[in-house]
């Protein structure tokens, strides 16, 4: 539709103007011609700026007015070219495009403004419940983003990053800008919003990470540049993550940046001093004093005074600033730790409650089958101290002896098989960002064990216990506002434990024991390398841990007087252990490692 020479046409919401690749323009207003769009329009233009084919184009003072609002479906570019000079009867007039996109409007294209000596083109855009998929760097005169409106910066590999330039003012009323950024350090490539005038209101920012692995920033990645008054605010629409880091949207001066750095808190403001209201002085009546004889004091030696040495000023330390670690790191750590420790046992975890008295012979015996049920709670912090993790776990293990024998009639050998099921749930919270993450581990184990007692009758003297398990797990990490991540882990755990039981004394009903012991456990359950939905590569960075335990246990074997002649016995105990690990549970997210601390 071409219009010119001071002509005017009104298009209501039932009309649709269309053009195709063989025509240069969809809507074209020139020479002070005006097209008024009441209620929106559907315009398709297969061409683009490169071949001067536009969905809407105005030149030499032409105008397209869609300010009344409506549903626009625009596939193509916009172009406002210059102005028409004033004449003896008409004023100078800019070429103008005004659109108020509402009601799920959709525009896919770019916006271009050119200038001539007579003036500059004008493209004014207001969006409410509308989407603009920007296909190339664009220029607008002004932009208002109301609620439900989205501007999506486009990006194609190998193509330049896009810039949206606003020649005058930007106003945010709850709309959203979606940038593409390589989330790394300050030098990262990114799309940008450049406002040559002022900003006002509030808008949201979302970021598509284009291959960034996360890095420590100093100033940050500049995404919004404001030349005028920067009164508008921008806040992130959701989490912005890359690698091990969370990024924030922060203002520095007039501009806005993406930063993984926690900025230093501002200096406290000192209140302005308040001048008290002046008070007129009171002039008392003069009083004649009574005469007093003068006193002639004798000489007085002053007491010596120690010189005052001023305290040196203590320099004020600069405020502490930190990088923001993602809480998902804590969930990966908790999952890896659980996978290596859920099925770890000591001898008496398996056999401590399996002794019984044969009712026919009165002999103490050991059952060939055993079952272990354990619930546990664990807490830890990560290496940065920012992430606090709590986990709850449940373990069920079943086992039984396959063979028992004695080599000398006094000792006893046991060989058996065991299997287990375990589940662990954990939750990590960041003390800096407040974001949280949840983890889950569910898995099984199968293996063999062997035990030797030097004295099977009363278990005095030396014992040696060993076991080996194959373990496999399904793991989940569910970060706040992130996709659920699933991965597997598997590997071997094995143990050798030895101890010696001393009988310290006994009386009618009780015997008193001391048992020093040592245990070495090999832990090598490894998680599969995993790439998150956001592109972060996660790797279990723990290379086979050897845990050593040295301890001593003091216990009593006995029964109450009311249980004389019965098989009920109790075994209260106190145990102290020293534990050492050759490796710390560690996870690497892209190039950043984090580990598990106490």
Identify the function of each model-found stretch.
Residues 310-508:
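Outer membrane beta-barrel translocator domains of Type V secretion systems
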Residues 447, 524, 537-598:
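Outer membrane beta-barrel transmembrane domains
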Residues 376-378, 422-426, 469-475, 521-527, ...:
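Structural signature of outer-membrane beta-barrel domains
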Residues 22-24, 32, 53, 61, ...:
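Transmembrane beta-barrel architecture of outer membranes
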Residues 45-47, 59, 63-198, 202, ...:
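Extracellular beta-solenoid/beta-roll
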Residues 77, 110, 178, 368-372, ...:
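Residue-level detector of the transmembrane beta-barrel scaffold of outer-membrane proteins
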Residues 219, 385, 427-431, 476-480, ...:
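Outer-membrane beta-barrel and related beta-rich outer-membrane complex signature
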Residues 181, 209, 219-226, 235-391:
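Interface/linker segment at the passenger-translocator junction
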């Amino acid at each position: 539709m071409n219009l010119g020479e001071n002509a005017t046409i009104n298009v209501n919401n039932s009309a649709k103007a269309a053009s195709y690749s063989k025509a240069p323009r969809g809507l074209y207003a020139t020479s002070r011609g005006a097209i008024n769009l009441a209620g929106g329009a559907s315009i398709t233009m297969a061409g683009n700026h490169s071949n001067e084919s536009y969905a809407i184009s105005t030149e030499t003072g032409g105008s397209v007015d869609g300010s009344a609002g409506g549903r626009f479906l625009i596939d193509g570019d916009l172009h406002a070219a210059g102005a028409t000079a004033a004449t003896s009867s008409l004023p100078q007039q800019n070429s103008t495009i005004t659109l108020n996109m509402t009601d799920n409007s959709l525009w896919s294209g770019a916006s271009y403004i050119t200038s001539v000596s007579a003036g500059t083109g004008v493209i004014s855009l207001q969006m409410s419940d509308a989407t603009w998929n920007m296909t190339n760097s664009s220029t607008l005169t002004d932009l208002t983003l109301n609620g439900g409106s989205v501007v999506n910066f486009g990006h194609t590999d190998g193509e330049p990053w896009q810039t949206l330039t606003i020649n005058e003012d930007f106003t945010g009323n709850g709309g959203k800008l979606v940038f593409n950024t390589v989330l790394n350090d300050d030098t990262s490539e990114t799309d940008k919003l450049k406002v040559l005038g002022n900003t006002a209101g509030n808008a949201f920012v979302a970021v598509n990470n284009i291959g960034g692995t996360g890095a420590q920033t100093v100033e940050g990645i500049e995404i919004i540049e404001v030349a005028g008054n920067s009164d508008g605010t921008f806040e992130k629409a959701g989490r912005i993550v890359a690698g091990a880091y969370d990024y924030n949207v922060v203002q520095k001066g007039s501009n806005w940046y993406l930063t993984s750095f926690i900025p230093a808190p501002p200096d406290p403001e000192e209140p302005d001093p308040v001048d008290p209201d002046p008070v007129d002085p009171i002039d008392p009546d003069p009083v004649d004093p009574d005469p007093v004889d003068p006193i002639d004091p004798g000489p007085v030696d002053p007491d010596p005074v120690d010189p005052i040495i001023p305290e040196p000023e203590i320099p004020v330390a600069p405020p502490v600033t930190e990088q923001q670690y993602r809480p998902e790191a804590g969930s990966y750590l908790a999952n890896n730790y659980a996978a290596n420790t859920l099925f770890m046992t000591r001898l008496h975890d398996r056999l401590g409650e399996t002794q019984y008295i044969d009712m026919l012979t009165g002999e103490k015996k050991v059952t060939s089958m055993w079952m272990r049920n354990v619930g546990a709670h664990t807490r830890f912090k990560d290496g940065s101290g920012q992430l606090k993790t709590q986990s709850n776990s449940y373990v069920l293990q079943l086992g039984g002896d396959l063979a028992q024998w004695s080599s000398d009639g006094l000792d006893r050998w046991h060989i058996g098989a065991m299997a287990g099921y375990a589940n662990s749930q954990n939750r990590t919270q960041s003390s800096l960002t407040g974001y949280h993450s949840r983890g889950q581990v569910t898995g099984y184990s199968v293996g063999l064990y062997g035990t030797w007692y030097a004295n099977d009758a009363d278990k005095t003297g030396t014992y040696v216990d060993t076991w080996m398990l194959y373990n496999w797990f399904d793991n989940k990490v569910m970060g706040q506002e992130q996709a659920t991540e699933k991965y597997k882990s598997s590997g071997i755990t094995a143990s050798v434990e030895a101890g010696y039981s001393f009988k310290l004394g006994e009386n009618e009903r009780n015997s008193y024991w001391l048992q020093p012991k040592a245990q070495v456990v090999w832990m090598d359950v490894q998680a599969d390398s995993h790439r998150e939905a956001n592109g972060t590569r996660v790797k279990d960075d723990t290379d086979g841990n050897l845990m050593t335990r040295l301890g001593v246990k003091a216990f009593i074997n006995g029964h109450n007087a009311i249980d004389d002649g019965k098989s009920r016995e109790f075994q209260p105990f106190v145990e102290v252990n020293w534990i050492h690990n050759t490796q710390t549970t560690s996870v690497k997210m892209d190039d950043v490692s984090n580990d598990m601390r106490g």
